[in-house]
Amino acid sequence: ITLSGGEVMSQDMDYIEQLCKTLYNKGYSVNIDTCGYAPYEDFKRILPYVNTFLYDIKAMDKATHEKFIGVDNELILENLKKLSADGARINIRIPTVMGVNATEEFMMDVVNFLKENSISVAQVNLLPYHNTGKHKYSKLDRDYDTEGLMEKPSNESMELFKNIFVKNGFNNTKIGG
């Protein structure tokens, strides 16, 4: 069972902890999909009951992260290091977006961060951007103005990015979730 949607770690942690504990104790595999932006104490509360953290990395430098996400990434990266040190099973998920992070340089920055900090990674998922929700904007009478910015990387680029991880020892790297 994967807790996802919105940000799980920003919900009522008493409820989330009890839900994870109940599911885990009933034998379910519990996964948490997170951006990592939460107090580490909240992660510690649920760590014993979570099988896998699906952990997003969207940008490696503070300025880019703040520009596109709205907050810097210091807490996110620190929490990732702590989760790994505490023995959590982690799948790194990289939403890959042209104009934001779909570059060889960014992928190498992620590889270097993971290696330099001895982050234990079970799997890397490169998630190509999609505009599946584009039609919802018209229903809200809003423009979907992302021309030239928020676009899906080519299949060739995604394969190149995957190979960067594989060549650096992250053999369980996949395109898609």
Regions found by a protein language model. Name each.
Residues 2, 9-138:
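Conserved AdoMet/S-adenosylmethionine-binding subsite of the radical SAM
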Residues 115, 122, 137-164:
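A structural motif corresponding to the C-terminal lobe/cap of the Radical SAM core domain
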Residues 170, 174-177:
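Radical SAM enzyme core and accessory elements
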